[in-house]
Amino acid sequence: MDYDRIRPVRFLTGVLKWWRLWPRKESVSTPDWTNWQAYALHVPFTFLFVLLLWLEAIKSRDIQHTADVLLICLTTTALGGKVINIWKYAHVAQGILSEWSTWDLFELRSKQEVDMWRFEHRRFNRVFMFYCLCSAGVIPFIVIQPLFDIPNRLPFWMWTPFDWQQPVLFWYAFIYQATTIPIACACNVTMDAVNWYLMLHLSLCLRMLGQRLSKLQHDDKDLREKFLELIHLHQRLKQQALSIEIFISKSTFTQILVSSLIICFTIYSMQMSPVLQDLPGFAAMMQYLVAMIMQVMLPTIYGNAVIDSANMLTDSMYNSDWPDMNCRMRRLVLMFMVYLNRPVTLKAGGFFHIGLPLFTKTMNQAYSLLALLLNMNQ
């Protein structure tokens, strides 16, 4: 049926192309390491900003100051890892999206399937908009407030080769941060959303496969051909799951590693700062905290959806009209159901299964680190 199967991600890849993080050609089989425009954009902003933040964190001698620096330093470090990852593996994701949008194997063939896609796309768009508001909403509080502070103060602490507290030199550092922060935010939000959409679409394809399996009838014309086509669809989805894991594994693993520290340092900074004396700063930190929690929660939700959709395939096959099929077909059904017992899961870094248990572990680790910091402060 006539429906754009990958509608939400087209906007996201368009944004990534603008920031030189996505192949500009439609069919690319290898990473393009000669993209000098990408280097010219991200080296002076993304990677230099990360370096300056780490230098400030290393030179710090105070726990609270170190926490204030690390909460943004770790975020930008994860961003740098995501940028390198997408430069290396964007062609893999581009190939998968091309298959989903053009191959007849993934064509939507009923109103029920179109409605399912349309509903999930609308919900994904709402989630993405809320995530954008939480992430981008921090920028005005962070960037505008320092303009009214006396003495001068940068949005984030970072090392500079000059004394930025001098009135004239302050503006060089401030303009650099005011330019870098929106760029980092836009790239980070968009790359996260592409990862989430790949997992969402994979779970939708598995649900579509389950619906088609449950509708198989013993008196269907070309029953064997339909069933073999569904087996081929399942095999292709498993291959795509491996490719998606290659694309999202390292970036998700990096995000999981730093998320517990970021959440910990954010809450610690909020507790150590006087709320009534700095309401805009407190509001910014609250939004930042929500965005960081969403950054680790949403991939686990979409990863869990892949696991659940794959696990439901056996039940869907069992709910078909297999008892009335001939012996040869029942034998094929039995072999396929045994094959379905192999789980379809996505891993982060080859270690962690991307699912809701990973989110709870990350939050528990953040709480433990926060308790340790508070005890050290006492």
Curated annotation (Swiss-Prot):
InterPro entries: 7tm6_olfct_rcpt (IPR004117). One of its GO terms (molecular function) is olfactory receptor activity. It is found in: Cell membrane. One of its GO terms (cellular component) is dendrite membrane. Pfam families: 7tm_6 (PF02949). This is Putative odorant receptor 71a. Odorant receptor which mediates acceptance or avoidance behavior, depending on its substrates. The odorant receptor repertoire encodes a large collection of odor stimuli that vary widely in identity, intensity, and duration. May form a complex with Orco to form odorant-sensing units, providing sensitive and prolonged odorant signaling and calcium permeability. The chain crosses the membrane at residues 38-58, 67-87, 128-148, 167-187, 256-276, 281-301, 344-364. Expressed in olfactory sensory neurons in the maxillary palp. One of its GO terms (biological process) is signal transduction. Belongs to the insect chemoreceptor superfamily. Heteromeric odorant receptor channel (TC 1.A.69) family. Or2a subfamily. It is a multi-pass membrane protein. Residues 59-66, 149-166, 277-280, 365-378 are extracellular. The atypical heteromeric and topological design of the odorant receptors appears to be an insect-specific solution for odor recognition, making the OR/Orco complex an attractive target for the development of highly selective insect repellents to disrupt olfactory-mediated host-seeking behaviors of insect disease vectors. Odor-evoked OR currents are independent of known G-protein-coupled second messenger pathways. It comes from Drosophila melanogaster. Interacts with Orco. Complexes exist early in the endomembrane system in olfactory sensory neurons (OSNs), coupling these complexes to the conserved ciliary trafficking pathway.
